[in-house]
């Protein structure tokens, strides 16, 4: 009755009454008895029954996941099959399926068109504010801001007393260069635009009136186009003069003199100028001649029998020719000292001064001197102060940039020569050809040739080679007959072999300047290159510290590598320190 009164609102059934019955708790004696009792052994049938009862109460998640995955896979398979069956587009469609019929855009087309017009007007206002690019403007529209942007774009700097002319925007716009010479440059030789050093040098080195052109001190990297930078002003000046007959050329000698440190560079410049003269089709019979060591005096005499307008020579050989009275320097109007820093490094400073003393003093006022260098050392500055009159200083890039095109520098700690050879073979295969391998001793050239000639076409270049052998080696590398040149420092300057992919310093140079000019054989004219240097651990620590700093500071491709192992061996301490947080 008590229960019925408490739950009188509930409808009671027999089942609910049965469920409400309270079972009597297990007797404590039975619990103690079951605890002390031993294990109960179950038969096989009993164990199977217990397992089945438990399995019925649990959900197998693995089975459920497998079922779901099977369903999804079946759906994907069916979709894939339907896609395979409908590879071709079906153009026979029912017009009733057109979902755009009766489409009403949320934005009114008229309003949308107004928005677009406002956006266009905003672009026009921005363009009016910023102005057109200097490339899009006419020459008369250029202002100081445009010229400043152009100089920054090509990394051109210039300084000097007096007015400095603006850089060339193209070959023909300012009419500084003769029209037919411009046509030879663009159509005959395929030079679409001037390089940075040409842009700033040419307009300032060519006089617009009959006055003597300005002296130039130029700082630029190898492969930057210096040859045309001084050749075009020379040719423009010669073009303004009357044609000279052969006997007058022989009597007065050349009108332009170019001094260079190596015979290879002299021949290269001569070929480049004569190429331009051939494309120019100038009627004045202008010609360029190079005289270098390795040719006999009779050969040089035969070369100079008809005189020349432009003479390219190394200092030592030119002195020999002057002593033998094969040429005179009475009428030099244009003097070029190319790679002046290298000529000084090679000990040609006294020879240069001796040659300059042969130039007649009364012609000094009418002579233009152009000096080009990769590095502006104190010796070069001394030469410039002594022989240049109020020069215009022009440079392309920073001091570091003047020594580095797009070169990735890699340093390897190799150990002995056998390990070096193993690295060398891998680098030649991995980094591409043609390649130049620099060594310090000519005996090493023979040793390497013996071990590499089975896989590569090798030519060598060192001091024991005759002039004909040197010229043949360079020509083979240029033509592709050979793909590896092994050379001492004699080839580090002046060589212009296109598309050199790899430079290997098999033996580190004794001077750091030589290292710079070795690696400058690759990465020329805007192309990328790789320079690999092998170190054994026996090199001069001070030299390697310079190398480490240069590799760190000059990294245009952000791929340079100077291994920590080398840094530790040579005691090179990083300037940065890990911060300690307490």
UniProtKB/Swiss-Prot annotation:
Alphabetized CDD domains for the sequence: DEADc_DDX23, SF2_C_DEAD
Protein name (record): Pre-mRNA-splicing ATP-dependent RNA helicase PRP28
Family statement: Belongs to the DEAD box helicase family. DDX23/PRP28 subfamily.
InterPro entries cross-referenced by the UniProt entry: DEAD/DEAH_box_helicase_dom, Helicase_ATP-bd, Helicase_C-like, P-loop_NTPase, RNA-helicase_DEAD-box_CS
Compartment(s) where it occurs, according to its Swiss-Prot or TrEMBL record: Cytoplasm; Nucleus
Sequence ranges assigned to domain Helicase C-terminal in this UniProt record: 416-570
Matching SUPFAM superfamilies: P-loop containing nucleoside triphosphate hydrolases
Keywords: ATP-binding, Cytoplasm, Helicase, Hydrolase, mRNA processing, mRNA splicing, Nucleotide-binding, Nucleus
Motif (Q motif): 170-199
Motif placement: DEAD box: 338-341
GO biological process: mRNA 5'-splice site recognition
Keyword Nucleus: yes
Substrates-to-products reaction catalysed: ATP + H2O = ADP + phosphate + H(+)
UniProt KW Nucleotide-binding keyword: yes
Main location: cytoplasm
Record's comment describing the protein's domains: The Q motif is unique to and characteristic of the DEAD box family of RNA helicases and controls ATP binding and hydrolysis.
Subunit-level organization: Component of the U5 snRNP complex.
Cellular component terms per the entry's GO annotation: cytoplasm; U5 snRNP
Binding site for ATP: 220-227
GO molecular function: ATP binding; ATP hydrolysis activity; first spliceosomal transesterification activity; RNA binding; RNA helicase activity
Its biological purpose: ATP-dependent RNA helicase involved in mRNA splicing. May destabilize the U1/5'-splice site duplex to permit an effective competition for the 5'-splice site by the U6 snRNA, resulting in the switch between U1 and U6 at the 5'-splice site. May also act to unwind the U4/U6 base-pairing interaction in the U4/U6/U5 snRNP, facilitating the first covalent step of splicing.
Organism expressing this protein natively: Candida glabrata (strain ATCC 2001 / BCRC 20586 / JCM 3761 / NBRC 0622 / NRRL Y-65 / CBS 138)
EC numbers for this chain: 3.6.4.13
Pfam families assigned to the protein according to its UniProt record, in alphabetical order: DEAD, Helicase_C
Residue stretches making up the Helicase ATP-binding domain: 207-394
């Amino acid at each position: 009755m008590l229960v019925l009164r408490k739950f009188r609102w509930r409808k009671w059934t027999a089942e609910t009454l049965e469920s409400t019955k309270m079972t009597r708790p297990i007797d404590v004696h039975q619990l103690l008895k079951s605890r002390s009792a031993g294990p109960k052994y179950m038969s096989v049938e009993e164990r199977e029954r217990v397992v089945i009862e438990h399995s019925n109460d649990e959900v197998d998640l693995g089975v459920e996941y497998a079922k779901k995955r099977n369903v999804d896979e079946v759906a994907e398979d069916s979709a894939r099959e339907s896609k395979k069956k409908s590879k071709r587009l079906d153009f026979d469609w029912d017009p009733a399926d057109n979902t755009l019929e009766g489409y009403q855009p949320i934005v009114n087309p008229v309003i949308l068109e107004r928005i677009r017009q406002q956006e266009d007007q905003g672009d026009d206002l921005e363009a009016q504010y910023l102005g057109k690019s200097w490339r899009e403007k006419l020459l008369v529209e250029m202002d100081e801001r445009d010229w400043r942007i152009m100089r920054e774009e090509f990394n051109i700097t210039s300084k000097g007393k007096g007015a400095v002319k603006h850089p060339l925007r193209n070959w023909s716009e300012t009419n500084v260069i003769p029209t037919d010479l411009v046509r030879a440059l663009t159509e005959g030789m395929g030079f679409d635009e001037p390089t940075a050093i040409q842009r700033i040098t040419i307009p300032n080195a060519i006089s617009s009136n009959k006055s003597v052109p300005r002296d130039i001190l130029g700082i630029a990297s190898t492969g930057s186009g210096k040859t045309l930078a001084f050749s075009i002003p020379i040719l423009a000046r010669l073009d303004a003069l009357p044609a000279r007959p052969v006997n007058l050329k022989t009597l007065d000698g050349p009108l332009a003199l170019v001094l260079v440190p190596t015979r290879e560079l002299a021949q290269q410049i001569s070929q480049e100028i004569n190429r331009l003269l051939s494309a120019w089709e100038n009627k004045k019979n202008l010609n360029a001649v190079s005289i270098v060591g390795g040719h006999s005096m009779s050969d040089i005499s035969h070369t100079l029998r008809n005189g020349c307008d432009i003479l390219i020579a190394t200092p030592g050989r030119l002195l020999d020719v002057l002593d033998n009275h094969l040429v005179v320097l009475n009428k030099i109007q244009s003097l070029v000292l190319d790679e002046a820093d290298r000529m000084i490094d090679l000990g040609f400073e006294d020879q240069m001064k001796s040659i300059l003393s042969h130039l007649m003093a009364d012609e000094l006022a009418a002579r233009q001197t152009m000096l080009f260098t990769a590095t502006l050392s104190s010796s070069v500055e001394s030469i410039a102060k002594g022989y240049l009159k109020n020069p215009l200083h022009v440079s392309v890039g920073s001091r570091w940039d003047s020594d580095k095109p797009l070169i990735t520098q890699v340093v390897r700690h190799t150990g002995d020569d056998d390990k070096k050879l193993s690295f060398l073979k891998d680098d030649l295969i991995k980094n591409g050809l043609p390649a130049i391998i620099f060594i310090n001793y000519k005996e090493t050239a023979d040793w390497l040739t013996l071990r590499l000639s089975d896989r590569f076409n090798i030519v060598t270049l060192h001091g024991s080679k005759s002039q004909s052998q040197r010229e043949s080696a360079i020509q083979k590398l240029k033509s592709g007959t050979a793909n590896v040149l092994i050379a001492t420092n004699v080839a580090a300057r002046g060589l212009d072999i296109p598309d050199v992919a790899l430079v290997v310093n098999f033996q580190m140079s004794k001077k750091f300047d030589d290292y710079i000019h070795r690696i400058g054989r690759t990465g020329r004219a805007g192309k990328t290159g790789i320079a690999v240097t092998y170190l054994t651990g026996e090199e001069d620590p001070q030299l390697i510290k310079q190398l480490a700093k240069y590799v760190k500071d000059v990294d245009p491709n952000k791929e340079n590598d100077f291994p920590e192992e080398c840094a530790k061996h040579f005691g090179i301490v990083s300037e940065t320190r890990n911060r300690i947080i307490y």
